[in-house]
Structures are given as C-alpha cells and as structure tokens.
Amino acid sequence: MITEGAQAPRLLLPPLLLLLTLPATGSDPVLCFTRYEESSGKCKGLLGGGVSVKDCCLNTASAYQERSGGLCQPCRSPRWSLWSTWAPCSVTCSEGSQLRYRRCVGWNGQCSEKVALGTLEWQLQACEDQQCCPEMGGWSGWGPWEPCSVTCSKGTRTRRRACNHPAPKCGGHCPGQAQESEACDTQQSCPTHGAWAAWGPWTPCSGSCHSGTHEPKETRSRKCSAPEPSQKPPGKPCPGLAYEQRRCTGLPPCPVAGSWGPWGPVSPCPVTCGLGQTMEQRTCDHPVPQHGGPFCAGDATRTHICNTAVPCPVDGEWDSWGEWSTCVRRNMKSISCQEIPGQQSRWRTCKGRKFDGHRCAGQQQDIRHCYSIQHCPLKGSWSEWSTWGLCIPPCGPNPTRARQRLCTPLLPKYPPTVSMVEGQGEKNVTFWGRPLPRCEELQGQKLVVEEKRPCLHVPACKDPEEEKL
C-alpha cells in the first residue's frame, strides 16, 4: 500500500535466527523477581528462591532466573526483547563490521511460528571508526650533546632527534625515544649539605582509651640522610632535633559493643495474589553500642516468601492491526483508477485477558476514506539511492549489504479531502493499492536497480550469556 507523500520502502532481507536457549518450564526451583526491566533485560526486585516457574508466574508481571546472574525471563507472553546496542567495530581503522542482537523472552509459548524462547536474532552492519590507518614515522639523526647538567661532580647530558623522516600520518608515531641521556663528569667535587628525611610515623599511644592514671604519649623520629652531609669537602649538618614527642589528646572512653534484641513478629503478606514477602525486625539495643563500640553484626531485618496461591489479573492487550480491506464504494462494482472516494476498514483482536483483568481500551475497528489505485498504470520516476541495508546473513559466510533505486509512482492530483456525508465535514482521503508505475529504463531495469557490496572484517556471533560462564 502506498500513501500520498510517503517515501518508497527499502528492500531488506530477513535477519538470520540461530542459537536456541530454552528457559525452565518444569518444576525445578528458580529465583523469582517482582518485575522484568525491558530496557536492560534484567530481573528486578528479588522475592526469593526455591519456587517453581509455575508459582513464580502466577503474576505475569514477575520474572525468574534459573541461577544467580543467569538469563532473566519475564512471565508475560513471549515477545522479542529490545535490540542490544551495536558491538564495537571489528577494526579500529578503515571499514569493518559490527553486530547487535535481540532475544525471544517470556514464558509458556513462542514469539512466532518456529521461534522458540531463548532464540537469538542477529543484525550485522558496516562500520568505520576512523577512515585511515596510522602510518609510523621515522627519526632524524641525533643532534649534538647539550652541556652537562651540573658544574661540579657528576651529572647528565642530553641529545635530541626529530620525528620527521618521514613524519607520521593518521595518528601514527615514531618508535623509541626523542631524546637520550648519558652520564657526564665535571671532575670537580661538590660539598653535600645534610637534609632531613621525612618524619617517621607516630608511635602508637600508650593507651587507647581513658584510664584515669596517666596521659598517653606518642613519639616520632627522623634521620639526617636526605642526603647525609659530605666529609670532603665538608657539608653542613641538619638543623634541629631528630626526635619529638607529644601528648595523646582527645582519647575516647573505652568502647561498648552493641548486641541484638529478639526478633519481632512476622508482618502480614502484603499481596493478595502471586508471591510476596513478609518481614521480621530486631533492634540493636541489648545493649546499645557506646563510645565508638561496634554496631551489631548482621541484618536488622529478614524476609520470607509468602505464597497466596491466587493468580493475579492479566489485562488484555491489543494484537497488531490487520490489513486494510479493499477500497470500495457501496453499490459500485469497482472504483479503481477513478477519482471516486471510497471506504476501507481494518480490525484488531484483544488477546490475553485472564482472571478478571481489564479489557483493552480503544476501538476494535478502524475506518478511513480512500482512492483506489490498485493495478493502475501510473507515470513513475526513479528515487534516489536508499541507505545501505544490513549485512545479510549476519552470522553466515560472505555477508553482503545492498541499496536500491525504485520506480516510484506519481500519484494522481485528486482532492486530498472529501465530504462523504452532508453535515460531517471534510475527511482526509488516502491513496490505497499497488499501482503499476512506468519509468524510463535504467541500467536495463524498469522497476528496481540494486547495488551490492561485501561486508568486511565480520566478527563472530556469540551468545553474551555463554560468555559469562
């Protein structure tokens, strides 16, 4: 179906499906969660473990895992997850390829015919992080040695070279160092004056809390070794003292460790259907920690799974709209290829409502006005090149990508609105049908011109869940 003002569709081959991973459907115990996060594909709100998939999925908003850190499966009817982000390009320069995937997730069914739960669908596209690859440069010859770094005793001298024979390109560099140094001797002795090394750490106080009998003290020391003064020629000694002492101030009273009181009563189950959590609490007050004593070890609360054994209501969900019916006008055999407006309709089904859940909101039937151009010969014009499509097959040998130019029909200049029933105002009219466009021959073709290219540096398709094991 072509509507007025719409762009010509791109021709894409279907992506390849592979790697089946079937979720738990039996009675083996699983980890049960309150919800499934669509954006990340992760389970959220742990209820607990040791329950069957059937009990966990009494509430279709819940989700489960067969093991900690494993694949999260929602309890709702199966559907495709969101596409993952594109993986990094397979090469860092020039043209490469990159992959992304989505998975069939849910419980007790299939995403579509022959597409089981856990199935991965892959997409592959070309990518280019950097147009050119780095080219290494070459060094010039070494320059002359610079003067010695000191005027007495021994020092170092340096010489340099430039990375310009040739210069690197596209982010490249020259291997090795741009300068080198060597020792040099002035044959002149220098006096070395003494300097203190850093203070050592304070020794522990003689007491850690108030005792009422003495004032604890702490001491630290340092050495005249950074450097030591020279003997010939003589250097100056370090000024000041090598030791210092101070009183320990602000010491606290001796600490008292805290201890837990008894567990309180178990709270009621907070839900009326599916699984919930009950809670017990205790207080760190037997005794309360004092004067910096440690708090009670362990948790102040603990939870237990409670099972109502009652299924939760499941709201109905609209299925996809069906195809538009043929554009017709009452009491007329055919209105195709004529400036005569008609009507067409499409339907949808409310599916999945259970246990007194809400019915689907909105209308089951959609009606619109239309002009029929089914099988009408129309003058056409060639479209611009479409964007490059995905690489097909994404996980098979020798994937290719394609783009097309299409013979697009020029729609008749019929009125865009009509008044079908007096008093109901103007209604928009849509062109419907598959016309027969006619374009001048292009590259030996009359309807579609296609160009194909191979996809380069293709990475392997690997299940991200298997890489975690």
Curated annotation (Swiss-Prot):
Enumerate the UniProt keywords alphabetically.
Complement alternate pathway, Disulfide bond, Glycoprotein, Immunity, Innate immunity, Repeat, Secreted, Signal
Localization annotation: Secreted
Where are the disulfide bridges?
32-56, 43-72, 57-75, 89-127, 93-133, 104-111, 132-170, 148-184, 152-190, 163-174, 205-248, 209-254, 224-238, 269-306, 273-312, 284-296, 327-370, 337-376, 350-360, 391-455, 395-461, 407-439
Q: Which GO terms describe its cellular component?
A: cytoplasmic side of Golgi membrane; extracellular space; secretory granule
Signal peptide, first to last residue: 1-27
- Interaction with Complement C3 beta chain: annotated segments: 351-359
Q: Where is the TSP type-1 domain?
A: 28-76, 77-134, 136-191, 193-255, 257-313, 315-377, 379-462
Record text on subunit structure and interactions: In plasma, properdin exists as dimers, trimers or tetramers in the relative proportions of 26:54:20. Interacts with the pro-C3-convertase enzyme complex (C3b-Bb) comprised of Complement C3 beta chain (C3b) and the Complement factor B Bb fragment (Bb), where it binds (via its TSP type-1 5 domain) with C3b and Bb. This interaction stabilizes the complex and allows it to become the active C3-convertase enzyme complex (C3b-Bb-FP). Interacts with C3b. Interacts with CFB.
What protein name is recorded for this chain?
A: Properdin
Its source organism is: Pongo abelii (Sumatran orangutan)
**Gene name?**
CFP
